Amino acid sequence: MLPTVVGKGNRMLPFIRRKAEPKPSGDWWTGAFTQEERATIEGVFAPLGGGTAESLARSTNPNSLGTLAEYLKKEHLRHLGYKLLDRADTLVNENVPVLDLHFYFAVRGGFYYRWRDHDPFALDEAVTSFQRQIGLGANVARFFREDKNWGFIPAHAGYRQLRIIEEKRGNWTLARALCEQAKAEGWADDWDHHIGRIDKKLAAMKT
């Protein structure tokens, strides 16, 4: 029997937070960042359609702040990205459109995973993000399948990256279960190839 994959069947999963965060209040944009930091964020923000970093930072949609954090991936700017993601976390709730949560958790996971070898909390935060994205998987897959603007189910960052993480940890049975679950939900990837490769690894471990 395959193990239960974390996140399966849950719409929302609790965050494992690095620290207690206050509820959003007041002018968070000017309170969280110095004038110099705000100028830095505006300076690196260069969307194709124009706009300001401040407009995204003041949004109540976590995906907007996640989008802004993606512009702060350089090592010397990552602390600013962490602040944006901390703020975004306080905005996650069941009123946020499920597709926005799906993309936010992918961005959040990717951002933290990038710094897994630099910051001691980063890998755990990345795993938590991918688990939360997986928890929304079945509902989001249904949306992609039925929405006329999509009509297909793309790849899933959470399933893909968490599979890699669990393989690196030697958790082959869990990695296989992730593949099976992602395949069942219809997410694009060569899941049969991954399952076959993992099966060979598991068989070799028994000999």
Residue ranges of each PLM-predicted region?
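Helical anchoring/docking segments at protein termini
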Residues: 1-79
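TPR/TPR-like (Sel1-like) alpha-helical repeat modules
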Residues: 128-135, 172-188
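Boundary/linker segments of alpha-helical solenoid repeat arrays
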Residues: 96-100, 137-145, 184-195
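Eukaryotic acidic, Ser/Thr-rich intrinsically disordered low-complexity regions
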Residues: 179-207
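Structural motif corresponding to the intra-repeat A-B loop/turn of tetratricopeptide repeats
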Residues: 75, 115-116, 120, 169, ...
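Helix-turn-helix repeat elements of alpha-solenoid scaffolds
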Residues: 33-46, 74-88, 120-139
